[in-house]
């Protein structure tokens, strides 16, 4: 089976004593879970999904950058979101497909739009995490220390770190 093959391949790669080598079996769930690229206010008790934060680069941000924290997603594909609605069921198998959502802005005005949910928020959450760490280090050090996170041992990650060290953080300790 695939799991045993993964284990055998990992053992073989280990015998090569090669750094950063590996193999893993990826489990398939049979369905995809669409994501709108937002974090929701889990303390909110009313109808709809109250947005706590819109993730930069995510589907909501890319579709309408005017959507902000405090706005409420009232419906997805014509299904009103009540306080007891399972929000995950509304986006099941919707990743990559266009859906129609209705968003009530902080002003009380509702706005409808088509949006293409993503398959994951991993990249946006990672970028958010790095940005938060950069801001925290800058604040705590008074701008003396720069923060870089090495995402991977590849050329793109090296270039990103190198660019920050010689750019944004060139005057830092």
What positions do the PLM features span?
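PDZ/PDZ-like peptide-tail recognition elements
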Residues: 11, 15-56, 61, 116, ...
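Cleft-lining beta-strand/loop regions that shape enzyme active-site pockets
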Residues: 26, 50-53, 59, 74, ...
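Extended, domain-scale alpha-helical bundle/helix-rich regions
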Residues: 3-8, 16
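Conserved catalytic motifs of ABC-family nucleotide-binding domains
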Residues: 70
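Short, surface-exposed helix-loop/turn micro-motifs enriched in polar/charged residues
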Residues: 4, 62-65, 82-83
């Amino acid at each position: 089976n695939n799991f045993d093959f993964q284990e055998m391949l990992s053992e073989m790669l280990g015998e090569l004593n090669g750094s950063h080598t590996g193999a893993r079996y990826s489990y398939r769930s049979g369905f995809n879970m669409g994501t709108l690229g937002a974090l929701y206010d889990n303390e909110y008790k009313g109808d709809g999904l109250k947005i706590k934060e819109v993730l930069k680069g995510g589907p909501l941000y890319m579709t309408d950058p005017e959507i902000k924290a405090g706005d409420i997603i009232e419906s997805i594909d014509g299904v009103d979101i009540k306080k007891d609605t399972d929000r995950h069921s509304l986006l099941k198998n919707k990743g990559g497909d266009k859906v129609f959502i209705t968003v009530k802005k902080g002003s009380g005005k509702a706005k409808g739009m088509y949006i293409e949910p993503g398959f994951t928020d991993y990249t946006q959450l990672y970028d958010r995490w790095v940005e938060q760490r950069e801001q925290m280090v800058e604040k705590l050090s008074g701008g003396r220390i720069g923060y870089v996170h090495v995402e991977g041992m590849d050329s793109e990650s090296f270039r990103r770190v190198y660019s920050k060290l010689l750019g944004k953080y060139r005057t830092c300790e």
